[in-house]
Amino acid sequence: MHAYSAAVLMGLLMVAEGAYVSTTACAHSAPNPTIQRYEPESIPTRLAPNRLLREPETTEASNEDRVVSIHAGIEKLSDLIKTGVSKVHGYLNLGPSATRDQPADEILRIYKLDDGIEKALVSPNLKAMESHVKELSTKNRKSEASVIGILTSHYGDDAVAKALVTAQKTVQSDDDVKTIWRLRNAQLSSWFSSDKSVDDVFTLLKLRHDDYLALASPKMEVLDDYMKLINRVTSGQETLLNVLTKGFGGEQTMAKLLLRGKEEPQTRELATALQNALLNKWVTDKFQPESVLKKLKLDRDLMNALSDPTRHTLTSYIAVFNTRNPGKKASFIGTLSAHYGDEMVANVLIAASRNGNTRRMANQLRTDQLSDWLNNQKSADEVFSLLKLRADLPNIDGALASGKLKLLEDYIKLFNREKAGDETLLKTLTTGFDGESNLAKALLTAEINPHSNKMVVKLQGELLNQWLLKGLKPESVLKNLGLDRGMKEVLSDPNRHFLTKYIWEYNSRNRFDRTSLILTLSAHYGDDVVARALAVAKGDSGLARTAAILQRQQLEGWLSSGKSADDVFTLLRIGADDFLPLNSQNLETLEDFVWLLNLKNRRIQTNIFTVVENKFGGDVQLARAVVKALNEADERGLRDSVGIASRYRSKLFGRWFDKSIEPKDVYAMILKVNGASADALEKSIVSRYTAFYKKRLAKAFTFDSPRRL
């Protein structure tokens, strides 16, 4: 029975013979022309296929005996497979356990084999212990004691496996070689008999703890031998790549491990072969680059993705993908952009370019991004949209906006050079912002940030120069800037500052045709509209300062041009309606002008009442305008809003009182009508004068005849 079991064992283990690692063992069946393939003749020396699980050659006779034994074992193995793998366990009696009577530690101590597995394997006492175990088995057929079981119980599967492979390469005598060979076979058979999967053996060998150094560990040979044994016996399709990928925790971890392994001489060859196998597997499975990006967990944070070493794995995959798919030209930057979006990629690269540790990589990827856009036939306008500059330029961090502007500018240069185009950054921005008005406004907002100021000022200058070269008048630029929508909008629109910039440049080139912002506004809207808007705006806390400055400029402009009060009255188109409630702004402006006029010309003073009275055509027309306004204010409950009408009424009625005109004489002396035929407004004038007259008369009487106490 013992000889029979040995034959079966020999059959089991001989099926494990073969190459240790090659691309056919690691990779998917589909070849990849861009990846180095390891043929048998190119496999590393330490992985040569003839180095495992063969009993060393001695004599021709012994070889013949071994061949006969092997064939017998294989035949028996075939029968076993047919009847079920479970029966194999019945023939194998080499499980890793200690004797029932003595613990493994005690046995090793007796034979002085407990001072390290390496020493134990080359100790003469190993043979003595082997004989002892064989004797136990002979005396007690139920004994499960085995040398490999005792060693494993004390030292562990991983330490024993590693030491056996190492010893196999260093022992000298034929007996020692045979002993190591038997122990290695015994270890494999013990795992098999206890239904250990290849994944279980990976765990037993503690390869995960070795990280990338596992690729150079002798334990890797043991894992590969066991995997081949399982594949032969079970007709399995397990590969070293799959086993390691599962064992190390997935493809992302495996990819990182292989990258690290490629950096070291002792692990480079196997790491390269396994990486090629991994890339081939993905290509065969028809994964798109973005899918591999997700597999490598580069899809969660772009900045981290750029610093993650597995980005090199993705880059390598893209090269293989393009070779296998000539019609598709994927790129690393294109894959990132497809997942994260062009704008986010640009933002992160701008930030990374300011970090000394990532600057070089960021600049290279920035160049790749420009090339990717060009290869995909992107226009300058499309790149503007991709970068979302319309939203970003006036609203976000100036440094980021500046970086995006520079990126767009560089793309335009590349586009013009490669496509013989004539695009400009200014033209692209103008289109992107739907016109010069929006662009100018965005540039004004962005110029306050020191990071973007230089680029923004440059663009402002180009826009101004473009208008100057066209010979545009300031009023035309006013329209280009969208300042022709009404004076109220002008005062709150920042583009008035851009118009001021243009006027300054215009004046510097047109010395004999100089103008100003207030003159430009007046030329477009009219003095009266501008004056009214400025007077109203002075009551708005947000616009008061701007309105006051512009109003002062308007008044001084009239003065410097020699305008009289009558001229300004005419310019302002003052009429009866200017006395109406909430409508007296132009009369107030006239009063401000007369005050300034009198301040400048103290020798000749102008009386505002006289100017207004004369321009209205005398007392009657002025009285009709003033009383009409007062009546409307009473009807609308707005008496407090007609202060200027009240002042003119008091001044007018005061003159009549001073001329001793009694109320009953107003019809005939002032209005030139018969009282019976007077209209409602004329009767109202008389009524209001009567009230005024009585009040003034009462005051005069009280002063002349004070009441005695």
From Swiss-Prot:
Query: Which of UniProt's keywords are assigned here?
Result: Host cytoplasm, Host cytoskeleton, Secreted, Signal, Virulence
Question: Which domain of life, per UniProt?
Answer: Eukaryota
Coiled coil (residue ranges): none
This protein's record includes keyword Coiled coil: no
Give the GO cellular component terms, alphabetically.
extracellular region; host cell cytoplasm; host cytoskeleton
Q: Where in the cell is it found?
A: Secreted; Host cytoplasm, Host cytoskeleton
Give the range the annotation lists for the signal sequence. Answer: 1-18
Q: Indicate where this protein is primarily found.
A: secreted
State the span of motif (RxLR-dEER).
51-66
The keyword Signal is assigned to this record:
yes
Tell me, using the record's free text, what induces this protein.
Expression is induced during host plant infection.
Give the similarity note.
Belongs to the RxLR effector family.
Function comment: Effector that enhances P.infestans colonization of Nicotiana benthamiana leaves.
- Entry remark concerning the domains of this protein: The RxLR-dEER motif acts to carry the protein into the host cell cytoplasm through binding to cell surface phosphatidylinositol-3-phosphate.
This one is known as RxLR effector protein PITG_15110
